[in-house]
Amino acid sequence: MNILITGADGFVGKNLKEYLENNKENIIFSPTLEELDLTDSDSAKNYFNNNNIEYVIHSATTESKNKIYPKDVCEKNLKMFCNILKYKDKDTYLINLGSGSEYSRPNWIPQMKEEYFDKYIPQDGHSYSKYLISKIINLSKDKTLINLRIFGIFGKFEDYTNKYISNCIAKNLIGLPIKINQNVIYDYLYIKDFCKIVEHFIKNKPVNNTMNVTPTDSIDLISINDYIQLTLKIKPKIDIIKEGYGREYTGDNTILLKNLRNYKFTPIKESIDELISYYKENMGLIDRDKLLEDNFLEYAKKIN
């Protein structure tokens, strides 16, 4: 299978590339920006004309800095998607990586179902672009277009300075205090599960073209840190700025499970154990000064 992964140098794309390459029947295309600039129509046209692509996994997005996207994020994200749509072969499947932010952050409710989509329109540029792409896929009725709506996702290769679970593990490993703005309940999907889900939809055509990609069990931020500290044999301690709970970020996965045929997710504790082992084996990746800046906490203060 000839598979193009856009954004293959990012957290999700890098994991997908590593996972799918294990199947020797797959030929993975992971071009650099110089080889393929999806915001440039000529670049996209030439790439698709010169390469036989059977599947596109679109994980590329406009890069953010400390969780802040540039002003033209919506324009760039739409250009990338539209250029893929225009220049891919009509029989080439496109698996687009969507986001729970399509439901509009200020209006999130627990266990959002797919039919909740379009009740509200997202206000920020990144979420709005994801919303519009999802809308295009839904309205197209094209069976080659698939939108996988991701909520929380974690695993190796993610940015430990602003991704909660890796941030928590890294700080605990080097003895830094854990401080959160407010407790929140999340759907955290392990990257290994996501890779298996994508592989399933390459091998098996989905019944639904858009679905939430979330685990069955949700978890709150305090419980995650408690488990990490218990595993590392650290006295449980976490500082919380605001009492109560922030806005829950969870989605209903009924449609996903119908398409996956009784898929069993990796238990959250098992996946955290694996990530702890990864950081223990790669302690050199952890930059104490970057963790002390605490960009993740500053971002959390702004959104909750």
Summary of predicted features, one role per range:
Residues 2-21:
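N-terminal Rossmann NAD(P)H-binding glycine-rich loop of SDR-like oxidoreductase domains
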Residues 82-123:
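Conserved Rossmann-fold NAD(P)-dependent oxidoreductase catalytic core, especially the SDR/UDP-sugar
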Residues 268-304:
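Amphipathic terminal alpha-helices
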Residues 131, 135-186, 191-200, 227-231:
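NAD(P)-dependent short-chain dehydrogenase/reductase
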Residues 168, 197, 204-244, 248, ...:
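Mid/C-terminal beta-alpha module of Rossmann-like enzyme folds, strongest
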Residues 38-76:
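NAD(P)H-binding glycine-rich loop region in Rossmannoid oxidoreductase-like domains
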Residues 6, 153-157, 179-188, 210-219, ...:
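Glycine-rich Rossmann NAD(P)(H)-binding loop
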Residues 54, 68-95:
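NAD(P)-cofactor binding segment of oxidoreductase domains
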